[in-house]
């Protein structure tokens, strides 16, 4: 019996073993519809989760010949309504079986059913990014791309559409103890061709696009997802019951914060990280006015993102507005400086204020009094470099600087006293997270205690550099060397009048609200 392809079929011939035919056909040529050629499968005796099925591969067309026989003895032609195991695995919604139709009366294409068609898989296997002429517009619309590197996605993994490479990379990262460090400025481009160049930036982008542990592994984490949903429902029921009874909400919110494990808290701090801010570098050589103008503009932009970062820390917005404003006013320059030190940790002798504003020590000679501050920043950064500060440790240290910055007498009002208890509870949670990060390093107990002490002792050096920087900035403001506006001016005025303030003024109350409106206007300038 001769087998011929229909005019709409693929270019590669498809062989069929007539000895295995179960159809009572008369001898003579028959035409296979294109949908059957397109969706042919081999059913072998393997389980659904076997590597042969999960790692679905298309055989090379060069091996297809007239004499090629299938390796499975139970080959049947799939009906048009049949879905491959790959489609069932990738499809996020429920699939309903379509009524079976006569294959000889209607040839229906599967391009509208399969989320990833054969041409897409062929291009993915060969690594080619060029479009195939056989790809129809509907198949292009149905194809999904990796949210991390923009390559063709193989399925819905860990909560997002991703390719096999990024899925495997994220799996290795969350299962192992990999503390990646970016050799550059933590803003490497991650795409199909450069995704392997920087593991730290690739993992950061995985978290940015929303990849989470067990985000889409329904077949392995179904019980965990159901259990988490049940726990969430119980928490919501508890909250609603407390609201109806009019009882205090403080205890419930503290329980929700306590439910966060140190690992979950660190991941939340990672997701709350502000983006890098770009500032146009002035023409060289620097003058006192040009350098101070660049630094003050950069500080004003970073303040907007810093307030947004603080509000993303679990439990911070539950504090009273008085405590929120006091904490931000007390530590804003320390937070900016420790971020500067982290960006400069891999660049000895340089200060990475921004990706496009990198200064050497000697460039600070043009500004009176700033060279001493540069030396303090470089010395503290060198000490962090000697300790080999890890990214997760940096996240916890920065949060501790914010939460431990208030040095005022305890308030007597019940509301303020309750906020103080929340602040202490939150600071303890961040401290536990730092201890957990250090314990993951595999060091002995004595070495862990010594490392924790060394990191905490460096916070006093950061505070000292911050005080020097504040004095210098106020001096430049008084001399009218550079104009100061917006949030930076608000922070400087608060620092000047801090000793005379006993209540939260109207300008302080508007500090957080003004930052939200300004954040929306400055988002296009941040990377």
Curated annotation (Swiss-Prot):
CDD domains: NR_DBD_ER, NR_LBD_ER. PROSITE patterns: NR_LBD (PS51843), NUCLEAR_REC_DBD_1 (PS00031), NUCLEAR_REC_DBD_2 (PS51030). It is found in: Nucleus. Keywords: Activator, DNA-binding, Lipid-binding, Metal-binding, Nucleus, Phosphoprotein, Receptor, Steroid-binding, Transcription, Transcription regulation, Zinc, Zinc-finger. One of its GO terms (cellular component) is nucleoplasm. A zinc finger (NR C4-type) spans 146-166, 182-206. Binds DNA as a homodimer. Can form a heterodimer with ESR1. Interacts with NCOA1, NCOA3, NCOA5 and NCOA6 coactivators, leading to a strong increase of transcription of target genes. Interacts with UBE1C and AKAP13. Interacts with DNTTIP2. Interacts with CCDC62 in the presence of estradiol/E2; this interaction seems to enhance the transcription of target genes. Interacts with DNAAF4. Interacts with PRMT2. Interacts with CCAR2 (via N-terminus) in a ligand-independent manner. Interacts with RBM39, in the presence of estradiol (E2). Interacts with STUB1/CHIP. PANTHER family: KNIRPS-RELATED PROTEIN-RELATED. Composed of three domains: a modulating N-terminal domain, a DNA-binding domain and a C-terminal ligand-binding domain. This is Estrogen receptor beta. The gene is ESR2.
